[in-house]
Amino acid sequence: MKKTFEQFRKSNLLFQVLKGPQHLECQKLFVLDSSFNPPHLAHFQLLSQTIKNFKLKDTRSHVLLLLAVNNADKLPKPASFPTRLEMMCLFADYLQEKLPQSVVSVGLTVFSKFIDKDKILHEQFVKGCSADIGYLVGFDTIARIFDEKYYHPLKISDVMESFMSGSQLYCLARGDCHLSAESQLRYASDILEGKFEPVIPREWGARIHVMQNDYPALRNVSSSEIRNKLKNGQVESLKDELPLCIYDYLINNKTIFD
């Protein structure tokens, strides 16, 4: 995987699919945008619940695991990009087994901003299909997307209009967020009621979906928490937070987070 990553890094490519179908094969695309450092069961739960609740009826869904490597010239910490890609490919096989009504691809992009990711996906992955794209993220990411300090002196409503008019955002409420779970679950309805205008247009609330986690035990699972447990020797507890394939990979490669 190191060679594959180096080839991408040295190329002029903006996006590349490394595993799975090279182009969209379904009417609904779910993009799991994460650091995959490592992939875990909370990622799976987000995908599973989103597909269950929002996939188009009687159709298959296409899942894209997308890793942004915009800082590829800097040594990533605490796991290298090739290592993350190996785990993403293992996770893709796990998803294909657990979500048989979906197809799964693994991709790289140089872009970190969602408006840029969305543009390149439409150009090179969706390729003119009238597909609905949903981005699966953490609530903290949604909060950053709509934080006006990242857009000053421009307005969020101007910068993000094209993205929000054609995309959906999905996440699960978390227990370790700066907002209570209740506030997270109300976030979209608060936008619809105009509580964030003029910064966030009220109509965008219909395109944001914050769900209650069906498995409370996974509510606080995060990649950083897993890395800390691994460093502290709390290996057994990780069995409840990781797919078996990722757990085995980490046990056999304990130094990747050093």
Curated annotation (Swiss-Prot):
Q: What do the Gene Ontology cellular component annotations say?
A: cytoplasm; nucleus
Tell me the GO BP annotations in alphabetical order. Answer: ERAD pathway; invasive growth in response to glucose limitation; NAD biosynthetic process; pseudohyphal growth
Where does the protein end up? Cytoplasm; Nucleus
- Which amino acid positions bind NAD(+), per UniProt? 35-36, 138, 140, 174
Q: What is this protein called?
A: Nicotinamide mononucleotide adenylyltransferase
Similarity comment: Belongs to the eukaryotic NMN adenylyltransferase family. POF1 subfamily.
Identify the Pfam families for this entry. Answer: CTP_transf_like
Question: Does Cell inner membrane show up as a keyword for this record?
Answer: no
Enzyme Commission no: 2.7.7.1
Which species does the entry assign this protein to?
Answer: Saccharomyces cerevisiae (strain ATCC 204508 / S288c)
Q: Which domain of life is it from?
A: Eukaryota
Protein residues bound to ATP:
43, 224-227
Gene name for this UniProt entry: POF1
